[in-house]
């Protein structure tokens, strides 16, 4: 089939109230864009590919379609309703297509029969009339109408079509799916593949395409991909879906796989490459641009479908005056139209506020109001509320003289619309609210934070006043609760009052624990929600009900604060690279950083000089921090003014932090101030860090870890965006190929690499977030530090990717430097984390570069009975018990390196009962005592003074037990 590729769009939504009586449309068991059979979480941390991708998990793409000719797959498609499938127009060109092709759904692996598989015949084909085979990259879209209706279940669901308001920013990670070739002209897979690609800015895509052929004109496309290639859709993926995820979790069909130059070719150097080597981003048909055509063809079989096809079926525009009414639809029309977009602006006299009262309301219901909805904005564009369902929203008092209402409908399911009155009222009718509204509630129902299920806004100051009938009290029951946690709820919080004056507190709440229900003491309750300028979360959703008091209610103050404020902190074992509070990405955008979950990067530290945040670093051990040399090179002679702050999220708050004075600074001896080569340094602190839920070390990469191009990693820091943020930010960045990096930067050495998106807007590390760690997943949930920010580009210039020092290449220097402090690393009273990530034994070598794994490396499993001489680097596991002999066990491990070398022992595991473990320098009669190993005080690494070292284990007890696992490597003394 034709070549391929990918691209897209997104939006921010809100809901103050969703109507009751949610019912599915006929034949719909679930809602579009949901995956009931799959884990709802999506990890982009370990990047996937179709060309360069991974196998999809069964159930995570229930809308996927395979078009088959003679039983063989040739194109993909997407289920969008119980009767319709979307595919590419270039897939349906053959004569009598509907009689030659079948639609297969519920299929995941072509090699095996699956109970979810279903085949459908095609009734009719609607190809976009503007599609031309001679110019197949425009209007490349077709609708397949099925003979029979699809019955939805957990394995088969439709994808959502985009709404006119959906916007997915440049850099957003989206997903393409298909059974296409795994490489250009390569084999076809049997199981469904997926690839995650970032959206490319439209103008940039056009400029790239001009390097292919200036005659190409792209009108209805979106583009996605990495400049260095390696990941794309390919032959056989055509017609398949390209989906982006809304912030509350739904998957939206943003594009249909259409076209591309080759498969996964790089296009960063297209101008320089010969014609036969040029590549392109993935090119997808832009569904949002073709919504009107889709609506006309998807609804023509509905007898009651409104035939008027205008942007808004009623007179929208500006409404002025002290009172008025807004109706949709109007006149003889019974239903509003599909694909409507109506906008009203209400303006009342200056100094007045606006009271909205809904007379009727019936809009297609959806839990997140993403299908059809009415949305209200303040004069400054702040989102006030988003509504859908069949229950009228409660009266809204907006503290402004101007508001904007927008109504959006999708391509199916039309209802009878709404009727509302607006009225200008005096400002003192109820207290003002910076939230933009005061909800006055006289009926039972639901309330929720602004923007829910999206993040609530900063500087919110929202208010609900609830009145119950006489003789009833008010009960608030929380369904969802996620508000920025803090000691005493000093940042963001929900407060419930027993009175309108706000003097009698019924409860205050923040964090992630679901509060207990709150009862009022009378028929009045006031609820307020406030937020500061950052760290926004999902907020809350709660049910208001009126109940009869069973007994006199005493005002009690409630809260949801757990002991020691560790409600979201998981139990964790001491180690490295694991956060007690796992990181969370809401937007999966490769260009614009977002605020991190507090303390989700617990190794990140602020390096202060003169009581001011200067740069960043990462904790390697309880006494060592790694950073960039350019951060500290001019300050290494003045360590006394340095301070390391760990456990820090907000630069303006010291909650949960540990402050450690700098003892000394060690800059790499080969650091060059001009070229920034060897840009790495270590800081030794005067007192050890205490590991807890907020402070943890990061792992070093192990000996088998390599950074592949396009691998997604994470950089964290306080100034990743244009303006300095006081809250820690995070940004996902893809690793770039060396030749791409060298194209944009001069002086790139073997000790540097680049990561980030080259785009026409702000980018990674643009303010030279010096010393910030770049961490990558070494295993699910475990991170290692692969890079240290060395330099970036000012945001006012054309953005480039950030330049990072390669930590892997500095491991020998890091270890040598730390070991030079003492023969044994950090042996204070607590056990220490390994400096390398936990993994399978075969991946635990973590050897220094001058002692690479080889055919002579040993992986040995022994019992404690004899003397074992080890003369090649490797690993050993020693297991013994008192049952090995009547007098316990005794053994020696003699590690012997070549002359002129020293030995590094890396301890990975030690547990013993009634065993003595002693390390000696030398062997036999020439050995001298070096250290005794204690289970509660195990070192991470031990360095020998000479070329021979002996480990002796002995026990005389029959109930003794020993488990020891270590690796050993040999290194030149010079």
Curated annotation (Swiss-Prot):
Tell me which domain of life the UniProt entry assigns to the organism this sequence originates from: Eukaryota
Q: Which UniProt keywords apply?
A: Calcium, Disulfide bond, Glycoprotein, Hydrolase, Metal-binding, Protease, Repeat, Secreted, Serine protease, Signal, Zymogen
Q: Which InterPro entries match?
A: CUB_dom, Peptidase_S1_PA, Peptidase_S1_PA_chymotrypsin, Peptidase_S1A, Sperma_CUB_dom_sf, Trypsin_dom, TRYPSIN_HIS, TRYPSIN_SER
List residues of the Peptidase S1 domain: 50-299, 590-819
Modification after translation (UniProt): The catalytically inactive 107 kDa form is processed both N- and C-terminally to give rise to the 66 kDa catalytically active form and inactive forms of 82 kDa and 59 kDa.
Show where the CUB domain sits: 312-425, 435-547
Region entry Disordered, spans = 830-858
* Signal sequence residues: 1-21
According to its UniProt record, where is this protein located?
Answer: Secreted
Entry EC number(s): 3.4.21.120
Query: Could you state one GO biological process linked to this protein?
Result: proteolysis
What Gene Ontology molecular-function terms does this entry list? metal ion binding; serine-type endopeptidase activity
Q: Which residues form a coiled coil?
A: none
Taken from the UniProt entry, a GO cellular component term is: extracellular region
Let me know which tissues express this protein, per UniProt: Expressed specifically in the cells lining the bottom of epithelial folds in the oviductal pars recta.
Q: Which residues bind Ca(2+)?
A: 112, 117
Induction remarks = By human chorionic gonadotropin (HCG).
Catalytic function, reaction form: Preferential cleavage at 371-Gly-Ser-Arg-|-Trp-374 of glycoprotein gp43 in Xenopus laevis coelemic egg envelope to yield gp41
Tell me the active site.
90, 140, 238
- Disulfide bridge positions per record: 75-91, 174-244, 205-223, 234-263, 312-342, 369-388, 435-462, 489-510, 615-631, 713-776, 741-754, 766-795
Q: PROSITE patterns annotated for this entry?
A: CUB (PS01180), TRYPSIN_DOM (PS50240), TRYPSIN_HIS (PS00134), TRYPSIN_SER (PS00135)
Q: What does this protein do?
A: Mediates gamete interaction by affecting the vitelline coat.
Family recorded in the similarity comment: Belongs to the peptidase S1 family.
Q: What is this protein called?
A: Ovochymase-2
